[in-house]
Regions:
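Negatively charged, low-complexity tracts enriched in Asp/Glu with abundant Ser/Thr
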Residues: 1-48
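Short, charged/polar surface micro-motifs in flexible loops or helix N-caps
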Residues: 44-47, 54-59, 69
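Residue-level detector of beta-strand face positions
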Residues: 50-52, 77
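Short aromatic-glycine-(Arg/Gly/Cys) micro-motifs in beta-strand/loop hairpins
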Residues: 62-83
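Mixed-charge, glycine-accented linear interaction segment located at domain edges/termini
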Residues: 77-106
Length: 108
């Protein structure tokens, strides 16, 4: 059925708690004037939350969920422009701390 809210078999996507954490961070950064748009994608092996300064640009950051790395390096990663992994771990809240004020600054 086309309107079935469940993800297709084999698809990876974010859970409600994870989306809540991501949207809280996004709202805080939009209020600070640093971010303008976002996008989410659920793929067969990972899910991606992309963050944009302008909708027509490449993403500034990507928050990736890769369940196959959960027992290794951690399923969560924040990836910057150019594919640089800024932080990786097992807990989303800890990984998102890379965006805490004073720890990281966007440079144009």
């Amino acid at each position: 059925m086309a309107l079935d809210p469940r993800p297709a078999a084999g698809m990876v996507f974010f859970e409600r708690r994870e989306i809540d954490l991501l949207m809280r961070l996004y709202g805080r950064m939009v209020a600070a004037g640093e971010w303008r748009d976002y996008g989410m994608a659920g793929l067969t092996d990972h899910a991606v939350f992309s963050i944009f300064r302008h909708a027509a640009e490449a993403p500034l950051y990507r928050v990736e969920k890769r369940p196959d790395l959960a027992r290794k390096q951690g399923q969560w990663a924040v990836v910057g422009q150019g594919g640089v992994v800024l932080r990786r771990g097992h807990d989303l809240a800890q990984v998102l701390r890379v965006f805490d004020k004073g720890r990281f600054k966007v440079v144009d």
